[in-house]
């Protein structure tokens, strides 16, 4: 698989996991497996991964009321991976990001 990592999943809960337990949460491709995720994190961030847990999240149903009636739809399904690193290791999400004022 090319690169299963889509983006870091930054929420209040995931930030708490990072601070307390050293676990990082990523949104990954639906067909990604734990081995691909482990290899991608180790290669991209240069850290040792202790374990990977995955969660398949179902997309929410959406309804929109218009003049012509009800339009029903659905958000896409997605998958998240909770990656635990070895002791003393950490990931800096923002190391490659440029400041907003530049470029």
UniProtKB/Swiss-Prot annotation:
Pfam families membership: Ribosomal_L23
InterPro entries per record: Nucleotide-bd_a/b_plait_sf (IPR012677), Ribosomal_uL23-like (IPR013025), Ribosomal_uL23/eL15/eS24_sf (IPR012678)
GO molecular function terms attached to this record: rRNA binding; structural constituent of ribosome
UniProt-listed GO biological process terms: translation
UniProtKB keywords: Ribonucleoprotein, Ribosomal protein, RNA-binding, rRNA-binding
GO CC terms in record: ribonucleoprotein complex; ribosome
Top-level taxon of origin: Bacteria
PANTHER family the UniProt entry points to: LARGE RIBOSOMAL SUBUNIT PROTEIN UL23M (PTHR12059:SF5), RIBOSOMAL PROTEIN L23-RELATED (PTHR12059)
NCBIfam families given in the database record: PRK05738.1-3, PRK05738.2-4
Assembly mode: Part of the 50S ribosomal subunit. Contacts protein L29, and trigger factor when it is bound to the ribosome.
Family as reported in the entry's similarity comment: Belongs to the universal ribosomal protein uL23 family.
Purpose: One of the early assembly proteins it binds 23S rRNA. One of the proteins that surrounds the polypeptide exit tunnel on the outside of the ribosome. Forms the main docking site for trigger factor binding to the ribosome.
Protein's name in the database: Large ribosomal subunit protein uL23
Species name: Chlorobium luteolum (strain DSM 273 / BCRC 81028 / 2530)
């Amino acid at each position: 698989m090319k690169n299963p990592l889509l983006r870091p999943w930054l929420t209040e809960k995931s930030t708490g996991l990072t601070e307390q337990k050293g676990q990082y949460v990523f949104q990954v491709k639906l067909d990604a497996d734990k081995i691909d995720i482990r290899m991608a994190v180790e290669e991209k961030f240069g850290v040792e991964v202790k374990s990977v847990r995955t969660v398949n999240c179902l997309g929410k149903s959406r309804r929109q009321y218009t003049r012509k009636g009800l339009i029903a739809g659905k958000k896409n399904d997605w998958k998240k991976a909770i990656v635990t690193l070895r002791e003393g290791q950490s990931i800096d999400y923002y190391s490659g990001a440029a400041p907003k004022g530049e470029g």
